[in-house]
Amino acid sequence: MLRLIMIVTALILLAAAEPEDCSWPDEHCNLFKTGQCCDRSMSCVVKNWKTVCSAGWFS
């Protein structure tokens, strides 16, 4: 289980190092290719010209 967590963490850090294209079906909302991909259960909010994921509509 710990190994899985480490792999997932490494993948997240790797993905954060470069702009994402939201190619997975359950990801969306990478406005201007400057923000991060959001899970479908989250909302996208634009802050400082970047797309960020938020659990609610306002953050």
From Swiss-Prot:
Main location: secreted
Highest taxon, organism lineage: Eukaryota
Keyword flag Secreted: yes
Cysteine pairs bridged by disulfides in the record: 22-38, 29-44, 37-53
A GO molecular-function annotation: toxin activity
Residues in the signal sequence: 1-17
Tissue spec: Expressed by the venom secretory cell of the spine. The spine is a cuticular structure containing a single large nucleated venom-secreting cell at its base. It is an independent unit capable of producing, storing and injecting venom. On the back of D.vulnerans caterpillars, spines are grouped together by 50 to 100 to form scoli, of which there are eight in D.vulnerans.
Record-level GO cellular component terms: extracellular region
Subcellular location as annotated: Secreted
Annotated function: Probable toxin. Does not induce increase in intracellular calcium in mouse DRG neurons, suggesting that it does not induce pain.
Domain notes: The presence of a 'disulfide through disulfide knot' structurally defines this protein as a knottin.
Protein family: Belongs to the limacoditoxin-3 family.
Protein name in UniProt: U-limacoditoxin(3)-Dv32a
